[in-house]
């Protein structure tokens, strides 16, 4: 890309975001970076200074676009980087407006990279202190300018003329490095107005301008001086309210942003066509960008676009604006300081005069040159003064050079002396080492003292040498450096000597410790020897005493012999008695062991009996649990089958709706194909038309063709919008199908060589996956067809919206007639657009209404099917109730007979309780099923409950015969005209009917409360107990007992089972189960 152009246009595309991918959008832009071209919708081609695809990185964009501006800034020119595009197209990311110090290097945008290169360039110059850099930042929000570097965001005024524009009282902060600049940028971004929209989570609601001022002053090394301004502009994105879904303040902000960008496009168009009047003053953003567009600046126009076809219209508009901006020509000039420029002119004149003076002295000046005497004398005097000053400077330099020579000689002498001192120190160090090695037991203090003496001598010699050369400061500095370098060597040698001395001291200390330990051991041995001598003397005394006593015992030896013989006899007799005693103890022990074995055997027998009983109880409990488990899983299987059936019904309904949508989609595709074909023919016909007609008939035909072309273009546009909406729905269906998971029963694969818990096979999963993949394939194929049709529509729409053709439409029409033709044509196009829009809205409404009707019909069908299933279930439960009642009445009659004969035990009472609970639960299920029966309410879809009074009356008559009048039970006012009147007779009739019903018969034999209803597990246990139950009968009466119908029995007899009188023979414990209220009494 050539960097000589004053305005360059660059286009960059961002990658497709998640929202566009989720909608199923496809790419509508192709990039050719080698030829710097962009093709949109396969029909329109644009060429720019540089093109960056969505795969380009930040560094390549910066190096191509912004880096060449750095040379312009240091040459004294103004520079601008301006980012333009749709909202959410990546302008802020490319510019790096939100970057800070912690941003990753790879993700940094143009602003931090360019500012960093600016400071690095300043530091590489000969005089960095001659540069002064200040930054400022402001935003244009709602056609007002606010300072972003102040917390209160002061509103500022904009002053200027046609050539220049200035923001009054704008804060300018001096910075010295990149960190300071990024800090001010972060402050400005913090106060910038941002908000969330449907297209961007952090959408910029204002235009932000970050300005860097660079000013250089002249110095002795460099006499150039200039000032430059770098403007980095991040414009707010253009947006459509339909896509951003903005409301309230967001909508007002969007309108203001679009208004400012519209004026900016008008300015670009005026500059491109080289109009005399440029509407800069129509908007604030165009006023502050006056230098950047057609003014004194090198400008880079960075257009950011989205590659998705859902944003193709916005992308096409952005590319058209960028293409217009290429035709703008800026006129940049160098911004120089007038004073610095005057100084440079005077210095050039001085050099010229000095050269002329030298030529005159040499006599080679031209003869025709004549000088003014006064001016020449003044110039000569000034030159003489300059020569004197230069001479003085040379003298000073010569004196400094002589001083340096003297110092060098002194340093040389000092170096020789130090070499001698070094030799002396080495000899002394050798003597010290020999002394230490020869005299190992030398006292450490003496060795250290001798080393200190050597070091002292060295320091003394060094001090003497310093005193000799004290008058030369440079020499003293070199001595200090030399002593500092020598000191570590001496310190290392001193450390070695100290280590050797410490080692010798340690050896000597060890020897002393060993000697001390030996002395202590000898002393301990002496004390032990003394104790042994005392002990030996004591033992000798005791031995003498024992000898004396032995002599006395000899005389009594005979008496002791007799006593010993007698003692032996007694001991023998004692041994015999002891043996007899031991035999008796053994017999007792044997008896005790036998008793313990017998007791242990009895305990084991009791334990076995107890265990047997426990096992029997556990067996019964496990059997009941297994039965409950079996019934529970059977219910779960039934529920799963019901859910599967329901799911299949939902899938069928969904498939039907999908088929309807696909049918509509196919119709739309056919219509879109027809419209695209017509539009292509019209485009070809219009392209083949060589020139605009001149006669009236030809002009009328052309206008009709143009209007027809506009109608087809608008129809194609609305068809494309409709196809996009259907593509969005299709993508939702694809996402739903992709997220579907199989729900079915599981069975484990059991093999002899593998763990049964390792692999689990899901029944029907493979069939489900195959079906899902087929559906996905079909939906994706439909999506591809939609994308192709949308691409074709966009291509035709782009061809139809060719601006060049529209501008040349009325070329052959006389100039005075063109406004009238344009006005009439614009009015006709507006009516056509409105008509097409209403037509498509009507079609969409009709389609939605048809879909709602189909949905209503499917729901109605589903409701009817559920009602039919509920009726079947109700009939099944009613039949179960009838069967249960027919069996339970016989058992209850038999049980009542047993109760009258007082032959009832606890088991019978419990079985009766189980029968009662089962009866109540069955009746509750039937009532619940009856309550769930629904009917339509006023023809709507919402089911409403219905009171089944007539049905209850019929059931009462069926169960209890004609003893109950159905009209008394139902209390149906429609059967009695008198009951509809609000009279005393009607009230009395209703009251009498109610009393009759209460007195004569109940609505059901047993009434149970909701709080006493059994759970499903308890119901299963009770059912199992009832099925396995048997009634207790006497052995002499094994036949079935039948109640005698001839015996009178009151219809409302009450049997109180829980409170029946008990006798000691019966021994029936009271029932602990919660009582139920029934017509038979409390149970």
Curated annotation (Swiss-Prot):
Listed SUPFAM superfamilies: P-loop containing nucleoside triphosphate hydrolases (SSF52540)
Keyword ATP-binding: yes
CDD domains referenced in this protein's UniProt entry, alphabetically: KISc
Keywords, comma-separated and alphabetical: ATP-binding, Cell cycle, Cell division, Chromosome, Coiled coil, Cytoplasm, Cytoskeleton, Meiosis, Mitosis, Nucleotide-binding, Nucleus
Tissues in which the UniProt entry reports expression: Expressed in the gonad.
Protein name: Kinesin-like protein klp-19
Gene source species: Caenorhabditis elegans
Polar residues compositional bias, start-end: 1044-1055
Coiled coil: 408-435, 487-650
Region annotation (Disordered) ranges: 458-479, 1044-1083
Phenotype reported upon loss of the gene: RNAi-mediated knockdown results in embryos that undergo early mitotic divisions as in wild-type, but which later then display aberrant patterns of nuclei and arrest before morphogenesis. RNAi-mediated knockdown results in chromosome segregation defects in mitotic embryos whereby chromosomes form a disordered metaphase plate and multiple chromosomes exhibit delays in segregation resulting in the formation of bridges during anaphase. The chromosome bridges stretch, break and sometimes form micronuclei.
Positions contributing to ATP binding: 85-92
Stored Pfam families: Kinesin
Kinase is among the record's keywords: no
Subcellular location as annotated: Nucleus, Nucleoplasm; Nucleus; Cytoplasm, Cytoskeleton, Spindle; Chromosome
GO CC terms in record: chromosome; condensed nuclear chromosome; cytoplasm; kinesin complex; microtubule; nucleoplasm; spindle
Similarity comment: Belongs to the TRAFAC class myosin-kinesin ATPase superfamily. Kinesin family.
Matching InterPro entries: Kinesin-like_fam, Kinesin_motor_CS, Kinesin_motor_dom, Kinesin_motor_dom_sf, P-loop_NTPase
Gene Ontology molecular function: any one: ATP hydrolysis activity
UniProt gene name: klp-19
């Amino acid at each position: 890309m050539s960097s000589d152009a004053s305005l360059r246009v660059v286009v960059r595309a961002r990658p497709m975001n998640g929202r566009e991918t989720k909608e199923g959008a496809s790419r509508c832009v192709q990039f050719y970076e080698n030829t710097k071209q962009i093709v949109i919708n396969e029909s329109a081609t644009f060429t720019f200074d540089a093109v960056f695809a969505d795969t380009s990185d930040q560094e390549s964009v910066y190096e191509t676009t912004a880096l060449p501006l750095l040379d312009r800034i240091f040459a004294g020119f103004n520079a601008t980087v301006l980012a333009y595009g749709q909202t959410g197209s990546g302008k802020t990311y490319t510019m790096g407006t939100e970057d800070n110090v912690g941003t990753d290097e790879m993700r940094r945008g143009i602003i931090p990279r360019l500012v960093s290169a600016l400071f690095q360039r300043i530091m590489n110059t000969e005089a960095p202190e001659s540069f002064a850099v200040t930054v400022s930042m402001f935003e244009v929000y709602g056609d007002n300018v606010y300072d972003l570097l102040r917390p209160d965001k002061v509103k500022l005024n904009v002053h200027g003329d046609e050539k220049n524009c200035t923001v009054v009282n704008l804060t300018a902060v001096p910075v010295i490095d990149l960190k300071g600049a990024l800090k001010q940028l972060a402050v400005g971004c913090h106060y910038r107005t941002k908000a969330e929209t449907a297209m961007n989570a952090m959408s910029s609601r204002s235009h932000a301008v970050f300005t860097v001022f660079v000013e250089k002053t002249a110095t002795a090394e460099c006499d150039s001086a200039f000032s430059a301004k770098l403007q980095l502009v991040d414009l707010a994105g253009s947006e459509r309210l339909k896509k951003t879904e903005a409301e309230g303040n967001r909508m007002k902000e969007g309108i203001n942003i679009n208004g400012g960008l519209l004026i900016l496009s008008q300015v670009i168009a005026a500059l491109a066509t080289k109009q005399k009047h440029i509407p800069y003053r129509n908007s604030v953003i165009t006023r502050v960008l006056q230098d950047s567009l057609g003014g004194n600046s090198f400008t880079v126009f960075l257009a950011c676009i989205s590659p998705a076809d859902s944003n193709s219209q916005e992308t096409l508009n952005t590319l058209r604006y960028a293409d217009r901006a290429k035709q703008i020509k800026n006129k940049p000039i160098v911004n120089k300081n007038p004073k610095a420029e005057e100084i440079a002119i005077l210095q050039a004149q001085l050099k010229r005069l000095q050269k002329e003076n030298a030529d005159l002295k040499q006599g080679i000046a031209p003869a025709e040159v004549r000088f003014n005497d006064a001016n020449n004398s003044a110039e000569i005097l000034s030159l003489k003064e300059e020569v004197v000053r230069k001479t003085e400077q040379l003298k000073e330099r010569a004196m400094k050079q002589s001083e340096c020579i003297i110092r060098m000689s002194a340093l040389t002498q000092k170096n020789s002396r130090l070499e001698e001192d070094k030799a002396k120190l080495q000899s002394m160090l050798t003597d010290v080492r020999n002394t230490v090695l020869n005299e190992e037991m030398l006292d450490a203090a003496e060795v250290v003292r001798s080393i200190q003496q050597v070091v002292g001598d060295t320091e003394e010699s060094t001090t003497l040498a310093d005193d000799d050369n004290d008058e030369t400061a440079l020499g003293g500095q070199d001595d200090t450096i030399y002593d500092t370098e020598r000191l570590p060597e001496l310190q290392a040698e001193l450390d070695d000597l100290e280590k050797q001395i410490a080692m010798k001291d340690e050896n000597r200390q060890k020897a002393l410790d060993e000697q001390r330990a030996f002395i202590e051991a000898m002393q301990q041995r002496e004390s032990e020897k003394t104790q042994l001598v005392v002990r030996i003397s004591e033992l000798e005394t005791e031995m003498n005493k024992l000898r004396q006593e032995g002599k006395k015992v000899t005389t009594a030896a005979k008496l002791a012999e007799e006593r010993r013989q007698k003692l032996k006899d007694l001991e023998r007799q004692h041994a015999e008695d002891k043996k007899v005693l031991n035999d008796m103890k053994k017999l007792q022990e044997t008896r005790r062991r036998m008793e313990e074995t017998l007791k242990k055997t009895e305990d084991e027998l009791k334990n076995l009996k107890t265990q047997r009983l426990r096992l029997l109880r556990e067996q019964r409990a496990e059997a009941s649990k297994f039965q409950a488990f079996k019934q529970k899983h059977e219910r779960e299987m039934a529920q799963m089958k019901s859910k599967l059936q329901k799911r299949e019904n939902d899938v069928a309904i969904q498939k039907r709706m999908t088929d309807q949508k696909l049918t509509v989609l196919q119709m739309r595709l056919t219509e879109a194909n027809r419209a695209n074909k017509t539009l292509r023919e019209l485009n070809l016909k219009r392209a083949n038309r060589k020139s605009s007609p001149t006669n009236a008939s030809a002009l009328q035909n052309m206008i009709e063709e143009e209007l027809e072309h506009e109608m087809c273009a608008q129809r194609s546009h609305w068809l494309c919008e409709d196809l996009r909406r259907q593509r969005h729905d299709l993508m939702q269906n694809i996402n739903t199908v992709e997220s579907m998971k199989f729900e079915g029963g599981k069975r484990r694969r059991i093999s002899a060589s593998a763990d049964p818990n390792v692999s689990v096979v899901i029944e029907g999963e493979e069939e489900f996956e195959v079906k899902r993949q087929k559906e996905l394939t079909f939906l994706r194929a439909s999506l591809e067809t939609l994308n192709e049709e949308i691409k074709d529509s966009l291509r035709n729409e782009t061809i139809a919206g060719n601006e060049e053709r529209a501008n040349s439409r009325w070329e052959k029409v006389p100039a005075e007639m063109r406004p009238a033709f344009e006005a009439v044509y614009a009015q006709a196009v507006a009516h056509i657009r409105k008509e097409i829009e209403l037509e498509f809205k009507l079609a969409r409404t009709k389609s939605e209404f048809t879909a709602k009707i189909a949905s209503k019909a499917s729901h109605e069908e589903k409701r009817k099917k559920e009602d039919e299933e509920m009726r079947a279930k109700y009939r099944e439960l009613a039949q179960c109730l009838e069967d249960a009642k027919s069996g339970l009445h016989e058992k209850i009659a038999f049980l009542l007979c047993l109760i009258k004969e007082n032959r009832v035990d606890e088991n019978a009472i419990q079985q009766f309780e189980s029968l009662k609970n089962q009866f109540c639960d069955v009746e509750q299920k039937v009532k619940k099923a009856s309550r769930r029966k629904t009917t339509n309410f006023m023809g709507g879809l919402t089911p409403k409950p219905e009171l089944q009074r007539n049905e209850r009356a019929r059931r009462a008559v069926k169960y209890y015969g004609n003893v109950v009048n159905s009209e008394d039970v139902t209390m149906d006012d429609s059967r009695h005209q008198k009951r509809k009147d609000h009279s005393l007779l009607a009230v009395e009739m209703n009251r009498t009917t109610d009393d009759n019903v209460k007195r004569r018969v109940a609505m059901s034999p047993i009434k149970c409360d909701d709080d006493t209803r059994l759970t499903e597990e308890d119901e299963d246990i009770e059912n199992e107990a009832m099925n396995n139950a048997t009634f207790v009968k006497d052995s002499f009466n094994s036949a079935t007992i039948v109640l005698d119908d001839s015996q009178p029995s009151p219809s409302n007899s009450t049997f109180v089972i829980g409170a029946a009188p008990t006798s000691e023979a019966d021994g029936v414990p009271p029932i602990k189960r919660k009582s139920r209220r029934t017509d038979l009494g409390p149970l």
